[in-house]
Structure formats: structure tokens, C-alpha cells
């Protein structure tokens, strides 16, 4: 996938890729708990960059 918006968890650095997110999707992400460490979603996710999960999958420890 290309041009995905990448967010990461403040606590464990887990990366979340969202393809073409709309405002409603961003609201869901902002409230979502981290699937890796369970950190509460409110103010947890940090916008990182525009990326490609297929090209970047080797760089992250996916759990």
C-alpha cells in the first residue's frame, strides 16, 4: 500500500498505518487503545509520517 498515514504509540512505539484516512477514521484512531501494549487511546497516538507498510514492514517488530 502506498501513501499511508503512520502513527506511533507514545508508550511502546507500535506503528499504525492508515490508508487514506478521513476525519472519522482519525477520530477512531485517536480514541483507540494500542493493540500492542494496551495503552489507553486518548492522546496516545502521534502522527509520524506518510509511509508504505509493505516497504517498511522489515523495519518494525510487528506483534
Swiss-Prot record:
<protein>
    <recommendedName>
        <fullName>SPbeta prophage-derived uncharacterized protein YotC</fullName>
    </recommendedName>
</protein>
